[in-house]
Amino acid sequence: ATGHGIAKHMSNITESRICQNCKLNFTIEPDDFSFYEKMKVPAPTFCPDCRRQRRMSWRNFVNFYHRKSATSGKNVLSIYSPESGVPVLSAKEWHTEDWNPYQYGVNYDFSRTFFEQYTELLKRVPKPAMDNDDGLMSTNCEYTSDFAMGKDCYLVIKAWKLENVMYSFYVVNSRDLVDVNTSFGKDEENYETINTKQCYKCRNIIDSQSCIECLFSFDLRNCNNCFMCSGLRGKSYCYKNQEVGKEKYLEIIK
């Protein structure tokens, strides 16, 4: 009853606490206390940023390590560090029948906690070294993560159906790209673009769609040959949002 009374009292105030990890102040609002009371959990001792870092640390897809295959002993690239203690196999090895995952099974011990045993099981069973299908449905795409159905790609994260793409993140169904962040499909021969779709031979453009040979621009639709422009629709040969004609435009960007 006392504990419930404290929780009920705390649900009506805002409290400032010091994060046990980063030592910075953070605030717990009344609505937060109400939620903790409803879920029957204690109030946090870490600030929101540190809690987010702790949750995200579970998943790694941008740091690669050199490892040895647990079955063949061959060198493999892995998202699991050597210090993790996790045995790894190449994607091709993991999908074969040359190893039996059931051999790693153990009986549940009711005298120990679930998470203690689950952690031990995670570190015992081999995992795919990389989250990609290199050697299966992808070719020459070893240095990729969260990746499928590609060819000749290097350091590409969270992507699929690509060809000749390098140093890019979240790209789908495109080809011949470098330094691209978020492509929603059918992009070709672009460099340093963000949030694009169906763009061709564009450089340094953001939030644009269906554009051709546009440079250093933002929020374009169905435009071609635009330089240092924003918010245009269906325009051609523009410089700083002014139509200048083909001849002058080519002179400007020369």
Where in this protein do the model-derived segments appear?
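N-terminal amphipathic/basic-hydrophobic helices that include classical n-h-c signal peptides
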Residues: 1-9
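Long, distal/terminal scaffolding or interaction modules
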Residues: 11-254
